[in-house]
């Protein structure tokens, strides 16, 4: 945990120094569109994820305590806002000190961070209110309708304002309002003060209303029952011989080495709507980037790959290993690891191939092989981080995992860069990556 806190702290300081320090040169209209988009994303996160206690032990405590449920919600909200605000303010102080030491200038990042803390507060309160609303059916329908309405209006305005380069009537007024949100970093007009106060008021009213509903606690009980059943399946379903079952899509069940994928499919079924929306939105973003802003494609793809890489600790392989299913279910360990990693990451390579095809680049076969080499390198780092950590720490603690992860990433990156300097040929680099990764997998198989 200290390692993760240090990583977040260093990242926050870097963001403050490299990005927030230049806030006076920002295009405030673009900042307004970004802030509005983030607000809509927060609404989606609140609708599709639970920010409230969801473990059975927590639910039992909630039913047995004399404390009102609204106080529990406010406590969770207070903790979420406090640690993020402290991280941001302290990183701003260190950023100011760093800039003064390096350049002698005083930019006052601390003063600017107050604005971000206020935006954090509004976003977190709204996120908690939406998460509370999802536990009550009628409120959930209202918020889903609000989310779809905001997403639709935002998409239409974005298309008309940036792609058609003109808008008229009500769309122009809405686009001007969205662009004006970015002015909070400069001057705060009374209109946006009223809007922000309105969002906070609606959020607290939603929290107060839903926390008094019995349906909210019942929904949390169902959530806790699901995770309790999920854990029981993980710990209690490691039988070598299993009878064929029928899956929820009507085909024969997964047996043998594929049996542990039942748990992944169970989670996929639970969040089917979220995954569908995620796929549609990601496809839409890539369509816009490829055909309208192709120069941004590599940055977008790099950010997605980086997010998947850095979140590898929460992937299926670590989760199954910690629960025991990776070792209890039938099949060779290395086969189960490879199958599980492929099912969790192969979509990245498919997305890369489809995107490259639509971008109409020359010599597609070369770029497919190039992408395959990078994908194998990507897989190798994840496999090394897991196996090295599992060998030294059977509990797979987060700090130990990321130490192995960054060690593999750094050493392999240095080796690849040296090879690139010596050969000056990216094709040679890809071949080396493929052969080296294949050799590593073979050595692990016959170790």
Swiss-Prot record:
InterPro entries noted in UniProt: SkfF
Membrane topology: Multi-pass membrane protein
Extracellular side: 23-29, 81-85, 135-141, 209-247, 319-341, 383-404
Alphabetically ordered keywords of this record: Antibiotic biosynthesis, Bacteriocin biosynthesis, Cell membrane, Membrane, Transmembrane, Transmembrane helix
Cytoplasmic-side segments: 1-3, 51-59, 105-113, 161-189, 269-297, 361-363, 424-426
Induction line: By Spo0A and PhoP, during nutrient starvation, especially phosphate starvation. Repressed by AbrB during normal growth when nutrients are plentiful, in association with the transcriptional repressor Abh.
Function: Probably part of the ABC transporter SkfEF involved in the export of the bacteriocin SKF. Probably responsible for the translocation of bacteriocin SkfA across the membrane.
Protein name per the record: Putative bacteriocin-SkfA transport system permease protein SkfF
